[in-house]
From Swiss-Prot:
It catalyses: a monoacylglycerol + H2O = glycerol + a fatty acid + H(+); a diacylglycerol + H2O = a monoacylglycerol + a fatty acid + H(+). Its EC number is 3.1.1.-. Keywords: Cell wall, Disulfide bond, Glycoprotein, Hydrolase, Lipid degradation, Lipid metabolism, Secreted, Signal, Virulence. SUPFAM superfamilies: alpha/beta-Hydrolases. Its main location: secreted. One of its GO terms (biological process) is lipid catabolic process. This is Secreted mono- and diacylglycerol lipase MDL6. GO terms for cellular component: extracellular region. One of its GO terms (molecular function) is hydrolase activity. It is found in: Secreted; Secreted, Cell wall. Secreted lipase involved in Dandruff and seborrheic dermatitis (D/SD) probably via lipase-mediated breakdown of sebaceous lipids and release of irritating free fatty acids. Shows activity against monoglyceride and diglyceride substrates, but not triglyceride substrates and does not exhibit regio-selective production of diacylglycerols. Cleaves oleic acid from 1,2 isomers of diolein on both the 1 and the 2 position of the glycerol backbone, resulting mainly in free fatty acids but no monoolein is detected.
Amino acid sequence: MRLILLFLAFISFVLCVPEPRKVFGPTSYEEPTSLPVDLPLLSQAAGMAHEPYCHFNDEGKTVGDAEIVWTKWIGLAVQRAKIFHSKSLGVTVSFEGTTASILSILHDVNLALRDPPKELNDAYDEGSQLLSGFVDAYMDVRDDTYAEIVKCMQKYNDTRVTVTGHSLGAAMTALAAMDLEHRLEHGIYKAFAFAMPRTGNAKFASSVDNRIGGRFFYIANGRDWVPHMPPRDWGFQHPSGQVWINPVNSDNWKFYPGQENHFGANTVDPIWTFDDHHGYYFGTGVGHGPGTCPASVGTHTY
């Protein structure tokens, strides 16, 4: 079965790969700095990013300072989403990363850049284009998660809304953060995208900077290959907000200002396994292997 899935994913990849454009967005040469966000917030966000990998029937359980209040979908046809109420991050929605489902895999390999759908168009600056598969994954969950977020904001009298996720869920995090910034009166509070692939073009990256810059962060772990893909010369570009953990799974992390920072994760050749993709982020295990169910926050010792 696994070979069949890999074969289908390969065929889809071949059919969907865009022509190289050889056009790059900006590259930052700013020196790295210390973290611009408190470490406990990153640890807490990592735990909630992992939790969608866990199964149903966990409403009422806690992840760090957060209670799980809603969960939907099982990651086969639609990526699982969970909503928490966190003392430190408010109403938080988290999206599941890629599963073994062929439909989930197809979201990753549908690499064509497309204009935002009409429902998202006003959330982006003109000229923004998004990776098609990630848009499809987000649109599948958009309406139901938004309705539940609004309910939770009212229930807990909390206007803070945070978005998080890992891998494919990190790409969905970026799209959801932009969407919610536009739709909610108070916008988003924070967004944390763990192991995020490139999700759109240079105009998309600039849109993120213009609209949620300083509140959006994406985290790369060691030589994880996922944040390196799709390549920049296919027209893709990361926004600002990179936090790089290097060496992998260590407590050596720094913030790399600007887009595609020259001193950041782009300086290393990616390792083509999932060893660095699933790992320890700010003392919290994320992904298959390091993560626990329910997720444990900040329990890993270095």
